[in-house]
A protein has these predicted regions:
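Short, acidic loop-to-helix structural element flanking the phosphoryl-transfer center
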Residues: 75-86, 90-134, 146
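Short amphipathic alpha-helical segments and helix-helix/interface helices
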Residues: 13, 118-123, 176, 180
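A general structural motif
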Residues: 17-19, 129-131, 157
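Phosphate/oxyanion-binding active-site loops and adjacent basic polyanion-contact surfaces
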Residues: 38, 77-81, 110-114, 118, ...
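Active-site neighborhood of HAD-like aspartate-dependent phosphohydrolases
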Residues: 9-62
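A metal-dependent, Asp-based hydrolase signature
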Residues: 41-103
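Short catalytic/ligand-binding loop motif for oxyanion handling, primarily in non-cytosolic enzymes
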Residues: 30-34, 39, 67-74, 141-145
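Substrate-recognition "cap/lid" segment bordering the active-site pocket of phosphatases
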Residues: 133-135, 139-186
Length: 186
């Protein structure tokens, strides 16, 4: 396994050497949630709610539904975290919604870790003075994502582009069109 990883690392380093602009995806690439499935974060939020005597029956279902609902009513290609919690607010009230939102961000931060292999690749690109960007289809804010990157040792990159903040996504390819213009890529 280690030999395969070293071989893959060398292959990626060769590609980095041939390019000036290096991009990384964020979730499930540079950063990992230290849970089996991403939605398990909502189970952990639920546990924290119980500890605070704010038990919300079926929170995970409500949270998944709220995200789906926010996506279905959005006029943009991607949504923001606040869009999800505006839907939740209608179910649980404004005060509780704000508390739950803070808990979810805290749980995200606690269970997000650097992917050691990608961190090694990032460090190599940085050592070669490459222009490094991060791109993600994600509802969490750029500010929050940047704090997670910093906490996990990703420093010295050029920029972070988040679909929720920009209202365009990688999935539609509009993010790439935007980046091509923004970064003057031929």
């Amino acid at each position: 396994m280690t030999q395969n990883m070293d071989s893959e690392f060398s292959r990626i380093c060769n590609m980095i050497d041939e390019n000036e602009l290096i991009s990384f995806d964020i979730y499930d690439t540079a950063l990992l949630r230290n849970v089996l499935n991403p939605a398990d974060i909502f189970d952990l939020v639920s546990l924290e709610l119980k500890k605070r005597n704010m038990n919300i029956t079926d929170f995970k279902k409500i949270r998944v539904w709220a995200e789906e609902k926010a996506r279905s009513i959005s006029q943009k290609e991607d949504i923001q975290f606040d869009d999800i919690y505006k839907i939740i607010e209608n179910k649980v009230g404004k005060t509780r919604s704000k508390v739950i939102q803070e808990i979810e961000l805290s749980v995200e931060e606690k269970f997000t870790i650097a992917n050691p292999f990608i961190k090694r690749v990032f460090d190599y690109a940085k050592s070669k003075k490459k222009t490094i960007i991060f791109i993600s289809d994600m509802y969490l804010s750029k500010e929050f994502i940047c704090s997670l990157l910093k906490k996990n040792g990703y420093n010295g990159y050029f920029e972070v582009y988040i679909s929720g903040d920009l209202g365009i996504s990688k999935a539609s390819s509009n993010m790439y069109v935007f980046l091509k213009e923004q970064l003057n890529i031929d």
